[in-house]
From Swiss-Prot:
A GO molecular-function descriptor: RNA polymerase II cis-regulatory region sequence-specific DNA binding
Gene from which this protein is expressed: ZNF334
Key words, A-Z: DNA-binding, Metal-binding, Nucleus, Repeat, Transcription, Transcription regulation, Zinc, Zinc-finger
Ranges of residues in domain KRAB: 10-81
InterPro entries tied to this protein: KRAB, KRAB_dom_sf, Znf_C2H2_sf, Znf_C2H2_type
Residue ranges covered by zinc fingers (C2H2-type): 237-259, 265-287, 293-315, 321-343, 349-371, 377-399, 405-427, 433-455, 461-483, 544-566, 572-594, 600-622, 628-650, 656-678
Taxonomic lineage from the root: Eukaryota, Metazoa, Chordata, Craniata, Vertebrata
Name of this protein: Zinc finger protein 334
Compartmental location: Nucleus
Coiled coil: none
Source organism: Homo sapiens (Human)
GO CC terms of this entry: nucleus
Length: 680
């Protein structure tokens, strides 16, 4: 039987579900992705059945990855109820701006399957003759038209209906007890599929829908319809590699690139490749400097919106993700996952070159540059290159003199956070690195590696000149300069000649740095205000007192060093001989006995010294200075210990006593000579 054709106007606006910004923010990422798929699929289906019009703004925004919310919220006042809509049906057809699409009854039902999220199981062969009544399963009532069959089927799938929704047929309302709209016998058109489409397309919903099968809540009916269709239908696009299925073939194609390794989008600047175009677009902003997302609080800009959202949590103080092990909180879930690996020891990122594993992907990326020899981060001041940006940033502070990291204990400042963290261990006594051979704990990993070499009992690095062996190559390099006479710098102000380049740089900074702060009492000038405060304490106050002996100090670091004499703590260990020291400067001076370094050279006679104190005393020979005077006889001396020994003559003190013959001595040297006489 030939069916009568009728026309209905269908525009994309009829199928569009709009969100305000507030509503959009309430959707989780899965719901947003679902909305995107629904809208793009509806638009594609309309185009496939002959819909021709310029691309709507919402589709353009979705394709560009932008948020599709509208400025003003729609209300039900923009849409008439079902009776008014039917009365104005002809007027809508006449004034509609979009192209009219013609359907037969059979084609209409089939196309509605595609347009409305594939929720109906009625195909072309599923449409019976008009002579045969249709049966609705829930109540067993007979229905006379296709429209009531379609409505009844939808009612069966979703029985929880918001009060504000009016897009239902008369028969479905009889099941649900809804009598909001009266049935008018004069309007026979209400039993046609035309009215069904109009019923469903002109509604706007304020209340969310609950879907009984999966428990999800949706704010718009179009999303609910598609969700039901996805749970009841098999996805035809399946990946042959991992059997994962996708609702769209384009999504499957992008997914398969993970297995094939295909990256068709190439950056014209650095030739880096990407699987999807959006990743390339985001990457290109690194080269162009474009940072379109700006923080309204601090005006900081970002390349992508996700980085901005994470940053904004800093201003709000919100740290939503807490570690169950240590209670530490994080702004991002990914940061928590990375942190948790520090508890589990998991290192999922492995280098294919050497097998070294890392807990973070960024660490692996930086490590791989060591194999390629790639150092992309270059200092504009000196041309030195680095593997990672953070190392370059720390290096640039050498040129600027900036030391933003300050120790709260001793006010010492550092170029980078890691150096400060290592320094703090000298105050806390923390030694997190344990030697597996002897169980000894050390402050830094580098110190542990250097210590483990001593267990091998082998000094691998030999000096070609004198045959001396060293455990470390760096120590050998410093030692060899004693033979070559290589000296990195001479500065007349201090008279120091440095064999170690780092020491030379330190001395240079000390001598050339501009002095900004001057002491009003002595005229002593220093480069930092904190140094001036410490200097003034030597005159007026000594606020730091030792609890053991009551001795006072003007600096907290000096007190810390002194307290080690009571605790016996000696944190500085020589890698060559294993000797330990309380203070770092003593440790540094001791190392020169192994390297042979003598950085302090006299300008008068050319004699050089390991220790600065010895050099200072030697200089007094040329200047004739004797600052230490005896109060008893007025005799003067160049060294303090010489004065101390001399004063024993006036006091009669003889502190050194022989255990064999009980003879006493004023000087230790004489006492040692005497003891040898007993051994002989």
């Amino acid at each position: 039987m030939k069916m009568k054709k009728f026309q209905i106007p269908v525009s994309f606006q009829d199928l569009t579900v709009n969100f305000t910004q507030e509503e959009w923010q309430q959707l989780d990422p899965a719901q947003r992705l679902l909305y995107r798929d629904v809208m793009l699929e509806n638009y594609s289906n309309l185009v496939s059945v002959g819909y021709h019009v310029s691309k709507p703004d919402v589709i353009f925004k979705l394709e560009q990855g932008e948020e599709p919310w509208i400025v003003e919220e729609f209300s039900n006042q923009n849409y008439p109820d079902i009776d008014d809509a039917l009365e104005k049906n002809k007027e809508i057809q006449d004034k509609h701006l979009t192209q009219t699409v013609f359907f037969s009854n059979k084609t209409l039902i089939t196309e509605r399957e595609n347009v409305f999220g594939k929720t109906l199981n009625l195909g072309m062969n599923s449409v019976p003759s008009r002579k045969m009544p249709y049966k609705c399963n829930p109540g067993g009532n007979s229905l006379k038209t296709n429209s009531e069959v379609i409505v009844a089927k939808k009612s069966k799938e979703n029985r929880k209906i918001p009060d504000g929704y009016s897009g239902f047929g008369k028969h479905e309302k009889s099941h649900l007890g809804m009598k909001k709209y009266r049935y008018n016998p004069m309007r026979k058109a209400s039993n046609q599929n035309e009215n069904l489409i109009l019923h469903q397309n002109i509604q706007i919903l304020k209340q969310p829908f609950d879907y009984n099968k999966c428990g999800k809540t949706f704010f718009k009916r179009a999303i609910l319809i598609t969700q039901k269709g996805r749970q009841t239908e098999r996805k035809p696009n399946e990946c042959n590699e991992c059997r994962k299925t996708f609702s769209k073939r384009s999504t499957l194609i992008v997914h398969q690139r993970i297995h094939t390794g295909e990256k068709p989008y190439v950056c014209s600047d650095c030739r880096k490749t990407f699987r999807v175009k959006t990743s390339l677009t985001r990457h290109r902003r690194i080269h162009t400097g474009e940072r379109p997302y700006e923080c309204s609080e601090c005006r900081k800009t970002f390349i992508d919106k996700s980085a901005l959202i994470v940053h904004q949590k800093i201003h709000g103080g919100e740290k939503s993700y807490e570690c169950n092990e240590c209670g530490k909180t994080f702004f991002r879930k990914s940061a928590l996952a990375e942190h948790f690996r520090s508890h589990t020891g998991e290192k999922p990122y492995e280098c294919k070159e050497c097998g070294n594993a890392f807990s973070k992907k960024s660490y692996l990326v930086v490590h791989q540059r060591t194999h390629r020899g790639e150092k992309p981060n270059e200092c504009k001041e000196c041309g030195k290159t680095f593997f990672c940006q953070s190392a370059l940033t720390a290096h640039q502070r050498i040129h600027t003199g900036e030391k933003p990291y300050e120790c709260s204990e001793c006010e010492k400042t550092f170029f980078c956070q890691s150096a400060l963290n290592v320094h703090r261990r000298s105050h806390t006594g923390e030694k997190p690195y344990e030697c597996s051979q002897c169980g000894k704990f050390l402050c830094t990993k580098s110190a542990l590696i250097a210590h483990q070499i001593t267990h091998r009992g082998k000094k691998s690095y030999e000096c070609n000149e004198c045959g001396k062996f060293f455990c470390h190559k760096s120590t050998l390099t410093i030692h060899q300069r004693t033979h070559t006479g290589e000296k990195h710098g001479v500065f007349n102000k201090c008279g120091r000649i440095s064999i170690v380049k780092s020491n030379c740089s330190q001395c240079k900074r000390m001598n050339t740095k501009e002095n900004l702060y001057e002491c009003s009492e002595h005229g002593h000038a220093v480069s930092k205000n904190s140094h001036l405060i410490v200097h003034q304490r030597t005159i007026w106050e000594r606020p730091y007192e030792c609890n053991e002996c009551g001795r006072t100090y003007c600096r907290k670091s000096a007190l810390t060093h002194h307290q080690r004499t009571h605790t016996g703590q000696r944190p500085y260990e020589c890698n060559e001989c294993g000797k330990t020291f309380c203070q770092k400067f003593s440790f540094v001076e001791h190392q020169r006995t192994h390297t042979g370094e003598k950085p302090y050279e006299c300008n008068e006679c050319g004699k050089s010294f390991c220790h600065k104190s010895a050099f200072r005393v030697h200089r007094r020979i040329h200047t004739g200075e004797k600052p230490y005077e005896c109060n008893q006889c007025g005799k003067t001396y160049r060294r303090l210990w010489t004065l101390t020994e001399h004063q024993k003559i006036h006091t009669g003190e003889k502190p050194y006593e022989c255990n064999k013959c009980e003879k006493t001595f004023r000087h230790k040297s004489n006492f040692l000579l005497h003891q040898k006489s007993h051994k002989e």
